[in-house]
């Protein structure tokens, strides 16, 4: 069976993250959703277009296009760093998204809150934590199946670049035979200092199998069902940056 090359997203191709300090209207809008949820009535209602027009006037958004996205929340791990954008000083607080394509504004509105409040690995983010948060919005595109298992395995599970590609893995559970899946976004591997083998080992564990991972890797043609690579365009904003821009937009 031929490997799948997914239809390229024109929305993904058009995005250029040119906001200040790697920010964008997407990251601001995601942070704004949680801020408004935890502070009902405190801020005027702003649309993504309001934010783009007032804060990022040169940023182009096609609202008719649909895209895949993930929202990530991180929290300062060192309270002594009052203003700090270094990723190493933040710890994961929630990350959820979708590979399904949906309008960008709706996707951010939905998954900014799901990632903050419904990630089962963490308790819901509380209002008091807002000042320590950093929010990232990762727009995904250029999906490509690089390996497909089955009776006639095809492809190369290592046909991807660290720091450039995210990986989505589907594999057969060695004990139950059920299909398991997990993904890591492109920035995770460099942050964790993983090589490609480490990445697959951690994907297998993330999907819920804590048995003999070496057996799975040594026989990946038997266990791996599909490996998909993809790219992401990430923008981030800290609370300090968000709060300053919110004051600017409401002045």
Swiss-Prot record:
Write down any Gene Ontology CC term: cytoplasm
Tell me the PROSITE patterns matching this sequence: AMMECR1
Q: Which residues form the AMMECR1 domain?
A: 21-246
Q: Which domain of life is it from?
A: Eukaryota
Q: Which residues form the signal peptide?
A: none
What else is noted?
Present with 1710 molecules/cell in log phase SD medium.
Q: What is this protein called?
A: Uncharacterized protein YOR289W
| Gene source species | Saccharomyces cerevisiae (strain ATCC 204508 / S288c) (Baker's yeast)
